[in-house]
């Protein structure tokens, strides 16, 4: 589990997905854990919940989009970068109320801060998300 306290809805969703992948955590338990630790408004709590469950429910579709816009095989993408890309693609392709520039910028910030990615990987993610 990530020990850092999440500050945004997207961080809550990302931390939930990271915990599921890395620790085998159950989605509802991890989500409630991070929602309890975050000091979010009810609207942001709802967004975090929608993003986390939306990515979980649409992982295959998010990966399909990722394959269409990336030349890199999914198996070559670091797990946290992959999760962040799924989160960004979900926001871009499957939600209608999140502005594209916000989805791209916030996803790139998540990758930079929590995926331990170098600038080349950050640039790759930025390019893929802008193409979606």
Task: Mark where each language-model region is.
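Class I Rossmann-like S-adenosyl-L-methionine
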Residues: 1-132
């Amino acid at each position: 589990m990530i020990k850092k306290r999440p500050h945004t809805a997207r961080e809550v969703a990302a931390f939930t997905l990271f915990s599921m992948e890395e620790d085998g955590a159950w989605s509802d338990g991890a989500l409630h854990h991070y929602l309890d630790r975050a000091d979010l408004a009810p609207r942001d709590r709802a967004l975090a919940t929608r993003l986390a469950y939306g990515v979980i429910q649409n992982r295959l579709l998010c990966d399909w989009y990722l394959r269409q816009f990336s030349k890199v095989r999914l198996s070559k993408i670091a797990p946290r970068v992959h999760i962040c890309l799924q989160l960004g693609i979900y926001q871009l392709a499957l939600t209608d109320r999140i502005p594209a520039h916000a989805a791209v910028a916030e996803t790139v910030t998540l990758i930079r801060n929590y995926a331990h990615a170098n600038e080349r990987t950050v640039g790759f993610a930025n390019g893929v998300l802008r193409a979606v």
